[in-house]
Amino acid sequence: MAIPNKLLFSDLLKHNVLCDSGVDHGLIISPWMHPPAHRILGWISRPSALRLQREIWKLDQLKGINEQEVYVKGVSSVSDDQTLERFPTLMNANIFNRNGQKIGLIADFLFHTKTGNIQYYLVSRSNPLIPGTSRWRLSLSQIIDK
């Protein structure tokens, strides 16, 4: 249940969020991030497939992780899909070369679990949901326009 120093965000996706009271807060569905600073602030979970309510968790609430659950301490902030759609994110964002041609999309990223700083992005040339698709590393120094 230890927290690694660095983590791929995809390692958190589809994990159930459990609080210190033992309540299941649903699956992690997306990151909460600050793209200009290349930093993850936390994540968003969906407590119920039937309700539109979503819960936002700060990165410093992370207390443990195993193969199926993420353990948190404290209370989440509650929001809805319409509000969260306005949150900026780079997940699934298109990547273009200097000539303006699309070369892929951001499929994942590696971040430091204590600071939230993103070390690099993983770019997929095709649909990242298809198993076995190739991914290549995009370092922050290669990004011209944030």
What kind of region is each of these model predictions?
Residues 1-146:
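Peripheral interaction segments used for macromolecular assembly
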